[in-house]
């Protein structure tokens, strides 16, 4: 008579499959119903139990992340974008310091992160820039993102020293990144058709030598706003050809044709921020943005304009929980696509719904990463607790590089024309 052991062994895979299915059904995953009714009948249950497990097609599963703020949390009409109250800011600005096992929590900002509060009354240049912006209905990322350097950049000792980063396409973004305080909406107001001309007029009036243009993400537009961005750059160059223009753009949802439109508009520096290391990107940025997609944007700019034809630039925030190896890997990936300039700055939590600061990086650590970036071959690196992607300290160096390259190009073209003229003269004489 046959032993019952082989029969039990044959039944074992089926029992394991049924147990695995039962365990999966108890997990708190959100699932998409496969039909009009999500509750199976008793007859369906019995037939499913008798069927072979591999033949059962599982319902598609998506993960509902309840630990982070969703896009709805950032929608302007559903969640306040007001900054933290002083008492809340004091409570939330904490950091763990000290060696392992002896860590302590501090609730005061490090001295290197404290900056004077800007005042329009104390600085006439600051007041003038602010008045011009209001008069022409223009927005700046300096104000919308609550940049700590606004007093320093806007309050330069003269017009050439003052810097403002103009934010195009309105003050409302279609994305909800968990580090950014810019307003969010699924359907922002329509574009202002007069914005390109108004922006060019304002910049010509200020008499700057270098300007940064950035924008909100406009996923609601077919081209992501690329043509509007490019038209603004062309108007600026028409009014003041000597003005150097840096464009800090979004990823245009990965549409490289739109990247090309902006890259060919006449700008001098193309900036696009990866913001953080690859492993933290899904938690820090809107889920529509990826680290690899950002690399493709930066790489495509070089393909369109040539390796020496344009400077590419990106920025990384520190203090979000990134590891040293993750930061090394991010820099290696950026060099692979020939990024020229990188900046490092301290992440600061703008409101309670945004990500908490994991660590306050010391000035010495920022200097260490600056040296490491330069050793890896980056053309320039601005690194410091209050450095942001458009910080003016980097612009002076980049401006000199651009003007030097422009001068070399002019000399090269002049030599080429002289040689051609000499050859034409010799042909005529012969």
UniProtKB/Swiss-Prot annotation:
A GO molecular-function descriptor:
4 iron, 4 sulfur cluster binding
Q: One GO CC annotation, please?
A: mitochondrion
Q: Which InterPro entries match?
A: Aldolase_TIM, Elp3/MiaA/NifB-like_rSAM, LIAS_N, Lipoyl_synth, rSAM
Question: Could you give the cofactor binding note from the entry?
Answer: Binds 2 [4Fe-4S] clusters per subunit. One cluster is coordinated with 3 cysteines and an exchangeable S-adenosyl-L-methionine.
Q: Where is the transit peptide?
A: 1-29
Q: What region holds the Radical SAM core domain?
A: 156-379
**What name does the UniProt record give this protein?**
Lipoyl synthase, mitochondrial
* Annotated source species: Neurospora crassa (strain ATCC 24698 / 74-OR23-1A / CBS 708.71 / DSM 1257 / FGSC 987)
């Amino acid at each position: 008579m046959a032993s019952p052991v082989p029969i039990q062994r044959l039944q074992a895979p089926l029992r394991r499959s049924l147990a695995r299915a039962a365990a999966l059904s108890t997990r708190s995953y959100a699932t998409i119903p496969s039909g009009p009714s999500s509750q199976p009948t008793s007859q369906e249950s019995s037939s499913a139990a008798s069927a072979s497990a591999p033949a059962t097609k599982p319902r598609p599963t998506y993960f509902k992340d309840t630990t982070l703020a969703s896009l709805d949390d950032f929608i302007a009409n559903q969640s306040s974008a007001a900054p933290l109250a002083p008492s809340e800011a004091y409570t939330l600005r904490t950091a763990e310091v000290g060696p392992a096992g002896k860590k302590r929590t501090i609730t005061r900002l490090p001295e290197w992160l404290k900056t004077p509060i800007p005042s329009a009354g104390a600085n006439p240049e600051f007041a003038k820039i602010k008045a011009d912006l209001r008069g022409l209905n223009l927005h700046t990322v300096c104000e919308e993102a609550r940049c700590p350097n606004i007093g320093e950049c806007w309050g330069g000792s003269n017009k050439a020293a003052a810097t403002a980063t103009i934010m195009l396409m309105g003050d409302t973004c279609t994305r909800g990144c968990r580090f950014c305080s810019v307003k969010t909406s699924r359907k922002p107001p329509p574009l202002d058709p007069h914005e390109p001309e108004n922006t060019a007029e304002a910049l010509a009036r200020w008499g700057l030598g270098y300007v940064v243009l950035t924008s909100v993400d406009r996923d609601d537009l077919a081209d992501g706003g690329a043509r509007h961005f490019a038209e603004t750059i062309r108007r600026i160059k028409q009014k003041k050809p000597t003005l150097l223009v840096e464009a800090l753009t979004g990823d245009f949802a990965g549409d490289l044709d739109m990247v090309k439109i902006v890259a060919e508009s006449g700008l001098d520096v193309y900036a696009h921020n990866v913001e953080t290391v690859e492993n933290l990107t899904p938690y820090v940025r809107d889920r529509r943005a990826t680290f690899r997609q950002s690399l493709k944007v930066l790489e495509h700019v070089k393909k369109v304009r040539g390796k020496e034809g344009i400077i590419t630039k990106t920025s990384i925030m520190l203090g979000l929980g990134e590891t040293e190896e993750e930061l090394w890997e991010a820099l290696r990936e950026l060099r692979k696509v020939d990024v020229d300039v990188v900046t490092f700055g301290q992440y600061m939590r703008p409101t309670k719904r945004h990500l908490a600061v994991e660590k306050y990086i010391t000035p010495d650590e920022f200097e260490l990463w600056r040296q490491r970036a330069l050793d890896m071959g980056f053309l320039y690196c601005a690194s410091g607790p209050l450095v942001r992607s458009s910080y003016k300290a980097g612009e002076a160096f980049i401006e000199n590089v651009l003007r030097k390259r422009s001068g070399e190009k002019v000399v090269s073209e002049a030599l080429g024309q002289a040689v051609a003229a000499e050859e034409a003269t010799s042909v005529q004489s012969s």
